[in-house]
Amino acid sequence: MPNLRPLAIALGLGLATLVVTDASAAPKKKAAGRAPAVSAQCSDFYDATNAGWLKANPVPQTGATTALGQLAERTRVQQRELLDGAMKSPQGNVQQLLGDFWASGLDEAAVEADGSKPIAPLLTRINAIKKAKDVPASIAALHQVGIPVAFNFAPDIDLKALDRHIGYFMQGGMGLPDPAFYTRTDADTVALMGRYRNYVKQILALTGTKPADLDAESQAVIALETELARNAQSLAGINNPFNNYAPISTKELTSRYRNLQLDAFLKAQGVNDDLVSLSDPALFKQLDGMVTRIKPEQWKAYLRWRVGDAMAPYLSKAYRDAEFEFRGRVIRGETIAPARWEQVLDAINVAAGPMVGREYAARHLSAEDRRQAAVIADKIRETQIEAVKANTWMSAEAKSEAQAKLAALKIEIGTPLRDLDYSVQPMGRGSFGSNMLIASTWRHREEMKRIGKGNADRRWDVLPQQPALAYDIAQNRLIVTAAVLQGPVFNAKSDAADKYGSYGALVAHELTRAIDAKGSLVDAKGELRSWWTPADKTAWNLLGNRVAAQFSGYEFPGVKGAKVNGELTREENLADLAGVELAWKAYLAAEPDAKPATQQGFFRAWASLWPQQVSPNEAAQRLTSDTMAPGKWRTNGALSNLPAFGATYSCKPGQPMQRVETDQIQVWR
């Protein structure tokens, strides 16, 4: 399916809940005295605000339940309703396509009767391979329909010219998520490889391999993938964008790797640019040799397997069951397959997500919602510019650069500014698998159009129907999806305190990214250039150290005896604090005469974003991997640094929700 960049910028949903106060912040009392009562708001604002939610949502046996997770679930139901409507009464060409796609996926009898027919043309082409020179053309044809084999090829930012995308040739073509699995010899990996071999056999049998040949062909497939893995980077290496950036002219590319016929490959993908990136010459030299060294029969088995594996979730039950038993249970750790409608929705979002997003925004995002969201985002930006001017830790040079970058920042709300070309081969309702290939081919075509100068902003790395609020560092833009503009993040009918405390604070959280340690690596013109002075870096690190120390003192809910990892969560915690600081300033500017009772709504709105209930197993996993602090501390940790919170709720310095002045951390206030 389409080889898209990971959607790593979606809004984090975080963790969960036990009642713990910051005992270290409480003043010492004489033994004989009796401590005065501390209000619930000044003791634990998270619990005081979210008591009703926490009671209504008990700790689950597995996974997590969160307020923002419930928002994500609601958007999926909204998408289902949209597709039901498109199926019954389509309005326009895009809805006709989506309605047919949806109907074909829900018709399980038709999917079962279809068997392997949707991929039959692809298998016929593969089986027609006679010589080594036929292999590259088959590789290119599969990439065209969104099934990357042998290697990956996808558009991404040109790191020396952020206004353009280039095509990246990278390692790929392996059926396991980590290349190390193919070469490790520990007992767990050996057991995993045994189950993987069985899965390969099942798919090969379904795609035409005779029973007598299954052992030999499955071994041939794994041998080919192992050869790819031996020359691949580690996962840590491949996730570093600078490790993958190595520009090369397409002319030189063709002369270096003649067997792979990469010039013909690029033409087949519709790419005419004169520059690509290929950072693993040893890997591609090896692959170039494999084209002629490996027998056509082995290539045919490998390509049939890759087609069957990629399409298995969208074909008959035999395919789906085999895929779920290995990828679902073993790789993803799932115990039960999702409901059919959820499987079909996921498939449509993979292949035709932008189409769904276009219709979703038209249905669920009003002009007034968009207008109000834009006004608040602009107010936050203005507030941040003024805060930069006034702050004491930034150098004059950095202040000038930061103001220029914030002034140039683009704000896109609801959907991307640039729409896509929705001309697609007509779909019917008789073959879900065939529709999947039609949509996947369209998605791949639109992805390839991103390559070239001036195309870098053609789409977002998140879909409009996914609740997300994100800063795109390469394009210096704030992205606010249509789906995120609903409760608990945004309600156009609520008062200003509510909107600024939730949506406004999240906007400010993201805008801080434009000028923080990472944002300072790209300037207002989109050039990779560090514009912080050494003194700026030192000042930011000192702020981060203080925040890390604060959060490291908090107990981790759900894991007995554990503390929050302040170092792991420091950047998110800094952005949270900056977010509530800026949003509060912007709110006061918008509502200067608001009474304390009204102002309290700002802080309740922030707390209402983060209620979470997490199972013990999930909490243990997140303790060591989650860069977001638990919801209790995202609420209390940030607010306890704000004098305005203490003033609004009459909290005294030293009480859990009001750190003493010398301990308070400030980023922009």
Indicate residue ranges for each PLM-predicted region:
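Structured segments of extracytoplasmic/periplasmic soluble domains
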Residues: A48-G52, A56, R74, Q78, ...
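Intrinsically disordered, low-complexity linker/terminal regions across diverse proteins
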Residues: V221, R256-N259, S277-F284, P338, ...
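Active-site-surrounding "flap" and adjacent substrate/cofactor-binding loops of secreted or lumenal enzymes
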Residues: S39-D44, A48-A113
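Gram-negative bacterial Sec-dependent N-terminal signal peptides
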Residues: P2-A26
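Short, solvent-exposed loop/turn elements at domain surfaces
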Residues: W53-N57, L176-P177, P488
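Noncatalytic, helix-rich "gating/capping" subdomain that lines the substrate-entry/channel surface
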Residues: A86-K379
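Hydrophobic/aromatic-rich, well-ordered segments within soluble, folded domains that form packed cores
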Residues: R34-K55, Y182-A205, R570, L577-L582
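Cleaved targeting-peptide boundary
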Residues: S24-A37
